[in-house]
Amino acid sequence: MNVNRVRIEKLQEEMKALGMDMYLVPTADFHQSEYVGAYFKVRAWLSGFTGSAGTLVVTRDSAYLWTDGRYFIQAGKELEDTGVTLMKMREEGVPTVDEFLKENIPAGGCLGCDGRTISISQGKAYADMMEKKQGRFLCQDDLGGKIWDDRPMMSREQAFLVDVKYVGRSREEKLADVRRTMKENGANTHLLSSLDDIAWLLNIRGNDIECNPVILSYVILTEQDVFFYVQEEAVSPAVREELEKAGITILSYFRVYEDVKKFKDEDTVLLDESVVNYALFEKIPGSVKKVDGINPSKPMKAMKNRVERENVRTAHI
């Protein structure tokens, strides 16, 4: 029997044990990155489709894969004999993923996914849909990971710092800029999970995603403190020393899911609901005020300073 068919059947057994009607597997890491490392390629491992964009939906007795026109031929070949039906996005008569879910999940049913792989805005939409159906939305279960026995380790390539001569502003200056924007938004805390923003803010780079110089990490920024959640094996003593000089506390990558539970009632947290993952959001106490807004670093990063402009010219001449 086709190996991917076997994997999907194992997933369906896990779903059945939890009373799930459908399980959603997007192409995503825990940071909504466009490209993902080997550890996060659950959709590809389950379905056999290796393209960079696609969403797998598994029901109790079938499976469906949505992808765009770039991959119709590739997906058709790779999904052969897997039992997965190819759903050609934006083709006439083909529903979107959300339309399919809404139409096919029964009243009182259950939708599941790994909540770390969807954004807050997506999670809220699915939760609202299931509430209207008087059903359940389970977002704490990584069922693909549960059955993936030889799953690759999460990347932990060595991080390195970028000298201010290349970027024009120190991490201390950038942190001060972001804190001013936080204050303007009435927030005393900022939860940051987009990897490019973290790389820019802390003047740090990594190699955790192929061809993307980023490091898997989260940041919690308060009025006084900076907490950098990262796989500590990726941080050398020299890098740690430099970050600590800037008042940055280095903590283990997954600890952020516990620390957000400690936000206080009087805190106001600025976060981008299109980027921060839903599972992390669900850990924040409901009594804590949240402000949905674009990461302050996003427009700052887009406006190149004199040093950056000069270095861009140098790199292209």
Regions found by a protein language model. Name each.
Residues 1-317:
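Terminal domain-start leader segments
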